[in-house]
């Protein structure tokens, strides 16, 4: 293992430890496919422990000593993620109040983290352009109950070299503990407008519209 990979693996270990301390469940992912390397459904209700994480990094997972991480979203970890997989999706999220200060820089966009409200509420996963209760924007997805998101310091590898590292981009005036102040309440309350394009009266063509005259309505 090269020195670069050793440093990255230590950073990933530290990231996993931080997640567990936050009460967030993480699982190992394949570097090549983003697919989980374990049967992970049980961890939607069961705690991922420090001991389990240490075993992954010590012994590997399914013969893999190099792997990425994902955080399980939803009530189990107390978080949800607005997943912007394109710059178009990022711009839409920024215009429509779907962002938070807790940002992960991904390969093509950003992940915005919010606090899951708990109290028995459920927020299912959403895919941009599918369904009526989520904006029809390609690349704008939602990771909620039953989902997961690639977690820092996961990497994208091409030709055996690291092309990108998933990293936190949080303003200096915040830390992850402040996420409790950014509770997700659902798209209806969160977004300014549910449609892809903002409506403007200035865009209407009124050229052939006549002004109202009361005399026109007289018999």
Region locations from a protein language model:
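DNA replication initiation modules
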Residues: 73-90, 94-95, 115-219
